[in-house]
């Protein structure tokens, strides 16, 4: 029940020079579906990532962090990524780590690279052993299937409860040079800031030094995947990866102070925001896409704190599902967000262009039918003005429906 989900034409997903993708059906959890993905990158590439902040992080997340640390310490660069769906390899203890490392070793053997040059990713059911033999058996087919144009198939290969594959692509001009950016993502539940059950892979052909890419991935994640919430749960497996293949004619970006870096950051952020918003639009059972804007704060942090209190609230989300203008729930969420010195008498609340609350109380001119008119729309903006500064923050969320319960109750059946 995706909300205004754009039609994705596979032909419009630009290949990124130096990146190939292959998939296989390995029967990890269900038969006859793509469930293994291999992404290969040329030696010229640099790779960086950010991962879940869940302390119960999955085995592949641990291994990814280890392998990227070796790259930063001067080791050989990352040459391949491998993803399986249907099983999260989380809550699996030492055997899970063994399986994640064995996956890397097997792919490295087949591809003629080192195990530490492979990053593993898993998504699916937690607390179940990874069927390592099936995963390994699928790797040769995925390698043989690699093509530069396989982005749409790759998006399909990483889906779990997603109803639609998520992908987008751009070409931009930086200092007179064309840069191609293409990315895929997955996720429909267990989504909140600081990553969630979400995978995102975004490649572009610019040449970016490793320390610069490490900064870029954090800045981009903070403006995109860390600005979405569906149900407030944070998963064990979430990962967001940037791949800079180095094949563009754009001169190498070696400093975050350069104009080229700023232009690239803006382009990558735009693509990442589309990928993250597609996750919200395909949120489990979602019928409405909501933008929460908090303005006039003392800091971005407090604006986000309030925005997430609104976006996480089951009472707010169910009110929007029902188109019920019980909008005191939003004020309550603002109040419990934890901003200690908030002056509620300065707060204004808008639904789109409708002023609901003014100076901390109901706007005398507000009519409930005006609020309901907005809430019946499929796309809604909740705007809060705090009246205490110039900072602002925006997040994206969705409503909470009966179908959300059904999807998650039936997930393992």
Swiss-Prot record:
InterPro entries: Arg_biosynth_ArgJ, ArgJ-like_dom_sf, ArgJ_beta_C
GO biological process: L-arginine biosynthetic process; ornithine biosynthetic process
Site (Involved in the stabilization of negative charge on the oxyanion by the formation of the oxyanion hole): 123-124
Keyword list, A-Z: Acyltransferase, Amino-acid biosynthesis, Arginine biosynthesis, Autocatalytic cleavage, Cytoplasm, Multifunctional enzyme, Transferase
Pathway linked to the protein: Amino-acid biosynthesis; L-arginine biosynthesis; L-ornithine and N-acetyl-L-glutamate from L-glutamate and N(2)-acetyl-L-ornithine (cyclic): step 1/1; Amino-acid biosynthesis; L-arginine biosynthesis; N(2)-acetyl-L-ornithine from L-glutamate: step 1/4
Biological role: Catalyzes two activities which are involved in the cyclic version of arginine biosynthesis: the synthesis of N-acetylglutamate from glutamate and acetyl-CoA as the acetyl donor, and of ornithine by transacetylation between N(2)-acetylornithine and glutamate.
Name this polypeptide is given: Arginine biosynthesis bifunctional protein ArgJ
Taxonomic lineage: Bacteria, Pseudomonadati, Pseudomonadota, Betaproteobacteria, Burkholderiales
Name of encoding gene: argJ
């Amino acid at each position: 029940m995706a909300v205004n989900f754009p039609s994705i034409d596979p032909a419009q997903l630009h290949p990124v020079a130096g990146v190939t993708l292959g998939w296989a059906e390995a029967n990890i959890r269900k038969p006859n579906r793509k469930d293994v993905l291999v992404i290969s990158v040329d030696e010229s590439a640099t790779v960086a990532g950010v991962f879940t902040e869940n302390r119960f992080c999955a085995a592949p997340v641990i291994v990814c962090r280890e392998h990227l640390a070796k790259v930063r310490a001067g080791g050989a660069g990352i040459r391949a990524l491998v993803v399986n769906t249907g099983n999260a390899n989380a809550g699996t203890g030492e055997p899970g780590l063994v399986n994640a490392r064995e996956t890397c070793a097997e792919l490295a053997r087949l591809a003629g690279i080192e195990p530490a040059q492979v990053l593993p990713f898993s998504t699916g059911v937690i607390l179940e052993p990874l069927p390592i033999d099936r995963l390994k058996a699928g790797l040769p087919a995925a390698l043989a299937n690699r093509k530069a144009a396989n982005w749409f198939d790759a998006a399909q290969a990483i889906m779990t409860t997603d109803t639609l594959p998520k992908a987008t692509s751009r070409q931009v001009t930086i200092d007179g040079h064309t840069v191609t950016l293409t990315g895929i993502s997955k996720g429909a539940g267990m989504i909140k800031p600081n990553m969630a059950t979400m995978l995102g892979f975004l490649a572009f052909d610019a040449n970016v030094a490793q320390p610069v890419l490490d900064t870029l991935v954090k800045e981009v994640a903070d403006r995109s995947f860390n600005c979405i919430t569906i149900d407030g749960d944070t998963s064990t497996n979430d990962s967001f990866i940037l791949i800079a293949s180095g094949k563009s004619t754009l001169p190498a970006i070696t400093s975050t102070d350069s104009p080229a870096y700023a232009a690239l950051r803006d382009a990558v952020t735009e693509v990442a925001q589309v990928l993250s918003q597609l996750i919200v639009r395909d949120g489990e059972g979602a019928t409405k896409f909501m933008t929460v804007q908090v303005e006039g704060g003392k800091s971005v942090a407090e604006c986000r704190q309030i925005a997430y209190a609104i976006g996480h609230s089951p009472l707010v989300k169910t009110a929007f599902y029902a188109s019920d203008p019980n909008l005191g729930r939003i004020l309550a969420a603002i109040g419990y967000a934890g901003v200690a010195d908030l002056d509620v008498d300065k707060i204004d609340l808008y639904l789109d262009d409708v002023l609901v609350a003014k100076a901390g109380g109901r706007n005398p001119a507000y009519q409930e039918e005006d609020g309901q008119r907005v809430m019946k729309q499929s796309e809604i903006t909740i705007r809060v003005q705090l009246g205490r500064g110039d900072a602002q923050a925006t997040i994206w969320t969705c409503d909470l429906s009966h179908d959300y319960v059904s999807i998650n109750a039936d997930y393992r059946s």
